[in-house]
Amino acid sequence: MAKTSLKIKQARHAKFKVRAYTRCKRCGRPHAVYRKFGICRLCFRHLAYNGSLPGVKKSSW
């Protein structure tokens, strides 16, 4: 989990656009965040397996 100070720091507007980065809305993880959902891959996997994300299902071929 991300520290509270890092979450607050991310919430502030960045002085330069290149300094802005995505952070998971659920756990605050800064890496591997899907832009479409706004959550990291770990939270995405957990929510998808539980059926909490509508329209998302496990693929098999």
Curated annotation (Swiss-Prot):
Keyword annotations: Metal-binding, Ribonucleoprotein, Ribosomal protein, RNA-binding, rRNA-binding, Zinc
Checking InterPro entries in the record gives: Ribosomal_uS14, Ribosomal_uS14_bact, Ribosomal_uS14_CS, Ribosomal_uS14_sf
**GO CC entries:** cytoplasm; small ribosomal subunit
S-S pairs: none
Q: How is the cofactor bound?
A: Binds 1 zinc ion per subunit.
- Cofactor dependency: Zn(2+)
Q: Tell me one GO molecular function of this protein.
A: structural constituent of ribosome
Q: What is this protein's function?
A: Binds 16S rRNA, required for the assembly of 30S particles and may also be responsible for determining the conformation of the 16S rRNA at the A site.
NCBIfam families xrefs: PRK08061.1
> Which protein family is named in the record?
Belongs to the universal ribosomal protein uS14 family. Zinc-binding uS14 subfamily.
Q: How does it assemble?
A: Part of the 30S ribosomal subunit. Contacts proteins S3 and S10.
What's the name of the protein? Small ribosomal subunit protein uS14
Q: Which organism is it from?
A: Mycoplasmoides gallisepticum (strain R(low / passage 15 / clone 2))
